[in-house]
C-alpha cells in the first residue's frame, strides 16, 4: 500500500492580498486625514489641551518700598523669603500625598499634619493652587524643593523687616502676610509703598521647570518713603518716655517732637510699644499710636492761649495785674493750689492760676476764646494723613454758663490729642504762624498762616519761660544754661459713664530754645500713680 504525503503548499490569492492592501492604505489614509484635521483644519482643541497641561500664568512680584528716616536710615525694608504651595491636581495624578520619608520630612519642616494635608488635597482634587506655608526662609525652601515632591513648588515673595526693632513701631505699624500695610504708616501709605505686580505667561515641563517665557507684563515699581522722623531723636524720645512712665507708674504715655520752621514730626513715641519683627506677645493695646488716637482735656496747657486772646481783645496789657482771689460760680469754688491775692500775667502762667484765667475768660465773649483754640489747631484733625487720628472734640453749645466759660479757660470742656497739643505749641514757637504738620521729610521754607499777632505771641512765650524757673510748676523741664518756654497741665479723667473719676492725665508742653524756638515738645502721662500727678 502506498502512503500519500500531504503537503501544505503556500497559496497566493490576489483577491485577499488586494483587500489587505486596501485595508492598510485605508487606515493610513484615515490617520493622515485625522492628523491633517488636528494639525491644519482644527488644531485649537489639541493646543488648548496642551496649554492646560503646560501653560501657567504667574505673578511677577514687586518689592515693597523702603521706609527710611530723614537721614536715609532704613526703618522698614523687605527681605526675600519663599512660599511653599501645592498643585492638588498634579499631586493626585501622581498618586496623591504619600506617607513616605520625603513627605514626612516636608511635613516636619513646615510643622504640618500629614494626614490633614492629604485630606485637604483630596477634598480639592481639581484645584491648581493651595498654600502650604508662607514667608519661609530661602534656605529651608531650597531644602524642601530638593525633595522633589509631586505638585509641590516654591514661589518667591518678601517679608517686612524693621532694622530698629521697637523704635517707632507704633508709628510705622506693620504689614500682613500678603505684605499689605494694616497699621500705622505702612497702612496710611500702602498705595505708595506697594507698586503694582506684573504678570508672566510661561510654559513648564512635567517637573514644573520653566521651559519657555511666552509673555510678560513688567511690574510697576513701588516708591520709597522718607519720613520726617530722625531715628536718633526717636530713640532718645522713646527711652525718656519709657523711663518717665515707669518712674511715674503711669498706665501709658505719649510724646511728640516737632521741627517748628517746617512742621515736620521729628519724633512720635508711645508707651507701651512692641517689636514689629515679633508680635506674638503683643496685645492690640500695644499697637495703638497714642500720640494721635488718645484724647484728653488739655487742662492748664491752654492758659497761654487765654492770655493771648485777652491781650488781642485789649482786656489786659502785658504788665497788667489780675485779681486772683478764690471766688464762687454757680455754687462751685474757683481757686488755685496756692493762695495768691493778685498775679501778673507772667505770674498767672508761672503759678498756673485757674482764678486768673477764669477772670480773663469771663471778661470777653466766649466765642473769641473758641476762635483762638480753633485757629491754633484744636477741634480738627492735623491733616498728617495717619490712619486712626482723632479730631478731638470742640464743644458746640447754644448757651454757655459762667462756670462753663471759666473752666473752659483752664482746659476743661474740650478734648485734644497729644499731636494737636504739640501743633499748638509749634504755632506758639512760630510766634503765631500755624504751619501744616508733615510725617514725611520736606525742605524749608514752609509757608504758614498767621493766627495771632507776632508781638502778642512773643510776649506770652517770654512769660512762659518763668514756668521752668524756681517757683514755677515746670522746674523739671528746666535745662541748665538753656532757655525753655513751657507750660504744665493736669486734668481729671472721664470715666465710661461720662463722669470725672479719681484718675488724672499730666502733661508738659513747651518750645526751645526760648530766644528763637526751633523745637516744640509735648509729653503726656496717663494716670501717673507715683505720688504727685501734676505735670512738669
Language-model features: locations:
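Periplasmic/cell-envelope proteins involved in peptidoglycan metabolism and beta-lactam response
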Residues: 1-279, 367-379, 496-499, 526-536
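Beta-lactam-recognizing serine transpeptidase/beta-lactamase-like catalytic domain environment
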Residues: 76, 204-216, 255-300, 305-529
